[in-house]
Amino acid sequence: MNIPVVRSSRADSSDSSARTLLEATGPGFLMCAYLGRLPAAMNQLGLLLVVSSAGRSLALAGAVVAAVGLGTAFGAPVIGRLHDHLGAWRVTCGALLIQTAALVVIWCAVSRALPDWIILAAGAVMGMANPQAGSVARAVWSSIARATDQPARALRIIRIGMGWETAADETSFVIGPVAAGGLISLLGAQGTVVALGVLTLIGEGMFVIWLSIHRDVVRPQRGRARFDSDRSRAHPTTTGAVVSEMLPVLVVIMGVGVVFGTTQTALTSVHAAHGTPGLTGPIYGSMGITSALVGFASPGLRVGRLRKTALGGIVVLLCSSTLMGVPSAIATEAVILCLGAAVGMTLVTCYSRVEELAPAGRVTGAMTVASTGNVLGVSLGSLVTGAIGDNLHLGNLPAAVAGAGMVVVALGEAGRAALRRRR
């Protein structure tokens, strides 16, 4: 297999981001990787709507969503390690088959009134079998970047690639829920399960095909040696040192997850109290738009990693504090757009750092650990905000605390770096 060749150019500094994307991977990868992550964005809300529309209790519907989320959180690190050891195409193919089987079980349970625990178990299996397409895609960018012996070019590919993946994640989590809602309206509960299965086969199946054609795309290659050796001189190589460097980044990623979970739950509570529940989805979804745009553009900003993290935390703190005042819908929308920009920049910065620290051959595993931190953060934010209850003014407090925590982490890393330089 030939990995798409990264072409050199004297005008690298003036290359557009879009051109760099296409030169590095080609349009086939961009399309297949995007389609591969859509089922994960669609299935969770889709199952909630399927269960509730099938006449089952809302409590069961919520429990199914929780089962999918917990399954994903527990399964992601295992899936990531399997990707690194067995090859991405094999693991993704196996995960696709398991997810399809789980959807068949859910269809049978819904259509034949089988016990609730069967739906819960199938939902948990679906979550555990999530192929982590986003993490695999990020590992592909890492593999391509490490295949070049031009460090400046490699760094540009990583930054733009991580920006693109964040944009892809955010837009998929806007498109996915909208598509799930449309399916349930058009096809009903049983038809939606069938449609989810077909779309999962198509989306993840196309990604499997791309990965099978480029089978060694995420495996260590001889061409990476020079780039990796350059990185090793500047970054820790022992396991303990890598964990020490990566832990603050994972804390920030989890903090971003708290912002997502808190904001979604708080908006739901506010609009339910105001009698405008239909506004929750569009307003929350708009955060994904600015997150995607800024996430894609932020790698071009000539600002250091810790400064970006601190700036993102400050904006999150200010925006979440503003939302605690329960502003009007228009003002809330403006604040949400700013909040999206902050989390988009922060996520790209963090994922780029995770790639930088990950040892060769373990990039996918590192990315899935980071994604798991984000998922756990979402769950934590939703849980705490839900526990706050009907106090609309305190609903966004967990997100504000998370923003302050990001600033503290950035300052702590900066202080530690300063101490090292003095030694």
Predicted features and spans:
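Intracellular juxtamembrane helix-capping segments at the cytosolic ends
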Residues: 47, 131-149, 267, 345-358
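Hydrophobic core of transmembrane alpha-helices in multi-pass small-molecule transporters
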Residues: 34, 115-133, 254, 331-345
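C-terminal ends and interior cores of transmembrane alpha-helices
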Residues: 97-114, 208, 315-327
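Helix-loop boundary and gating motifs at the non-cytosolic
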Residues: 10-73, 236-285, 349
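A late C-terminal transmembrane helix in Major Facilitator Superfamily
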Residues: 361-392
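C-terminal transmembrane helical hairpin of 12-TM major facilitator-type secondary transporters
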Residues: 307-350
